[in-house]
């Protein structure tokens, strides 16, 4: 059994209205060996990929595919490859369901195996791995098909890692789904998060949560924490006192002038990188300064704000979500060491590396060790049952934090404050980092401070909070880019056939041009726009 040809259809095609991969396979001798004639094959397949039990196949119910495997005649290997390729993508976090296997108009033993995909590289790899799975579990009398070593668990882990590398981030994926729900087509423009929404002159672009409507000057202001603080201060909005410093000694002097504890952070930074909070000694300030300057040569020393850490998301001038961010932490059970508790936390399937999943793994770094040392603890210490220990001082999800939805609880004064702040910076989508004792009470009453305004804020904490109600924060972005009634498609015509395709295309283009349209045309001769 081997793959003779691979075709990728990236748009509507003969088989489906969505992208599919078509493999031309030759079963060779296996044409005479459907699953019913391969003793133990089905059992070994289901032992290796037990989630295939959920495939309905032609029976449209769980277990349908398994019934096909066990029927008197069984099913052929092309059909098996189709289902494995689909399931591998599902296991890697890509929800695809469509597939079909057909042998019409092909030589005996050859079949077209068609299955859907989201990421092309992942879909192609799924087909290759599916073939290797089949060859590996063939019964002994067919073992001469492939005798190379094969560790399915390791192969699956490598495949999932490939899928995670190629997958859209959570925020971009949510925006793409919101576009699909509104029948807005989208195209990925690079291997990162740059996505085109809509076609032609109606298109918009997003890169994560930056949009084609985001002003560059607004992003520049938001990235300059000192400038942001000054603008907000001029409007009478609550901000901490801060200074820019250029060497460790100056950082210590400013910290002493502000009064300990203080915060040290890079002037231009993201995702909480090199942000050190609650610094209480000159030595800690010097150490934090050195780390911050690796991110940006200009460093900020800021008064430390006590209270809870909130992210207020503002889209198109309106607060759409609020989350309380809780720093990465462990909870004692009276038996396990702190190191073991961290391992247990990271076993949560929702946690991954970086921004690939809903939550990020907790990493024990210098900041965590400093907090342990200050508390007289080590990684080998055992916490009493129920005792919470924070391994971070900031609640960024990118450093292992969790989120609690507070959208319905924000006080009206705090909502207005956040909307004014984002409007002052000029962002269409902005995240306000706000520290206060209680978001349900006005900052005018209990105090609080805006410590940062974020361009391109992450959506993870709102889409999938650890506690509370998930919020649709992607929909408002799409509705802002494409208000109700606005167009997002241009008329497209596809011309196919045996002969005369280019001539017919030119004729149609000419007729449309005479009607006053600016026509784009792609033929075997080249690509033309308005005749050029």
Regions found by a protein language model. Give the residues of each.
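ATP-dependent carboxylate activation and anion-phosphoryl transfer catalytic cores
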Residues: 1-181, 318-321, 326-333, 337-340, ...
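Active-site nucleotide/adenylate-binding loops and adjacent lid/helix of ATP-dependent enzymes
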Residues: 39, 45, 204-366, 370, ...
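Phosphate-binding loop of NTP-binding sites
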Residues: 482-532
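C-terminal helical accessory/scaffold domains
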Residues: 364-383
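A short, glycine/Asx- and small/polar-enriched loop/turn
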Residues: 198-203, 256-259, 314, 442-449
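Conserved N-proximal alpha/beta basic substrate-recognition cap immediately N-terminal to
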Residues: 115-257, 270, 512
């Amino acid at each position: 059994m081997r793959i003779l040809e691979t075709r990728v259809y990236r748009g509507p095609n003969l088989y489906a209205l969505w992208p599919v991969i078509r493999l031309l396979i030759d079963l060779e001798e296996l044409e005479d060996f459907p699953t019913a004639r391969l003793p133990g094959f089905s059992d070994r397949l289901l032992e290796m990929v037990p989630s295939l039990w959920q495939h309905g196949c032609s029976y449209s119910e769980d277990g349908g595919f398994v019934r096909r495997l066990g029927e008197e005649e069984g099913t052929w290997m092309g059909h098996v490859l189709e289902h494995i390729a689909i399931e591998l993508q599902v296991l890697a976090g890509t929800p695809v369901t469509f597939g079909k296997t057909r042998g019409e108009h092909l030589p005996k033993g050859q079949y077209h195996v068609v299955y859907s995909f989201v990421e092309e590289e992942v879909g192609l790899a799924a087909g290759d791995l599916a073939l290797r799975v089949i060859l590996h579990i063939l019964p002994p009398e067919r073992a001469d098909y492939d005798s190379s070593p094969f560790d399915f668990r390791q192969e699956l882990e490598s495949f999932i890692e490939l899928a995670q590398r190629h997958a859209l981030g959570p925020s971009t994926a949510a925006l793409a789904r919101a576009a699909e729900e509104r029948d807005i087509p989208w195209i990925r423009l690079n291997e990162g998060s740059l996505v085109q929404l809509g076609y032609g002159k109606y298109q918009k672009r997003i890169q994560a949560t930056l949009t084609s409507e985001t002003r560059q000057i607004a992003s520049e202001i938001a990235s300059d924490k000192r400038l942001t603080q000054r603008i907000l201060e001029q409007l009478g909005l609550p901000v901490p006192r801060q200074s820019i410093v250029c060497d460790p000694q100056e950082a210590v002097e400013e910290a002493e002038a502000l009064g300990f504890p203080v915060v040290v952070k890079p002037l231009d930074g993201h995702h909480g990188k090199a942000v050190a909070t609650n610094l209480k000694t000159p030595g800690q300030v010097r150490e934090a300064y050195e780390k911050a300057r690796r991110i940006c040569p200009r460093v900020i020393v800021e008064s430390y704000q006590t209270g809870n850490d909130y992210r207020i998301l503002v889209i198109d001038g309106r607060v759409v979500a609020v989350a309380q961010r809780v720093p990465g932490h462990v909870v004692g059970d009276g038996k396990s060491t702190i190191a073991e508790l961290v391992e247990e936390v990271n076993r949560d399937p929702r946690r991954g590396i970086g921004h690939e999943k809903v939550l990020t793994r907790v990493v024990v770094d210098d900041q965590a060790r400093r907090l342990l040392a200050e508390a007289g603890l080590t990684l080998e210490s055992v916490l009493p049952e129920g005792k919470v220990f924070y391994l971070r001082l900031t609640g960024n999800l990118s450093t292992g934090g969790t989120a609690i939805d507070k959208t319905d609880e924000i006080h009206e004064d705090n909502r207005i404050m956040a909307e004014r702040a984002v409007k002052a910076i000029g962002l269409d989508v902005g995240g306000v980092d706000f520290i206060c004792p209680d978001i349900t009470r006005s900052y005018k009453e209990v105090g609080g401070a805006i410590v940062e305004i974020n361009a391109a804020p992450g959506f993870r904490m709102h889409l999938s909070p650890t506690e509370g109600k998930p919020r649709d924060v992607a929909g408002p972005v799409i509705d802002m880019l494409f208000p109700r009634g606005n167009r997002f498609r241009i008329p497209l015509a596809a011309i196919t056939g045996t002969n005369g395709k280019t001539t017919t295309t030119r004729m149609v283009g000419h007729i449309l041009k005479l009607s006053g349209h600016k026509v784009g045309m792609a033929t075997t001769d080249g690509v033309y726009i308005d005749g050029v």
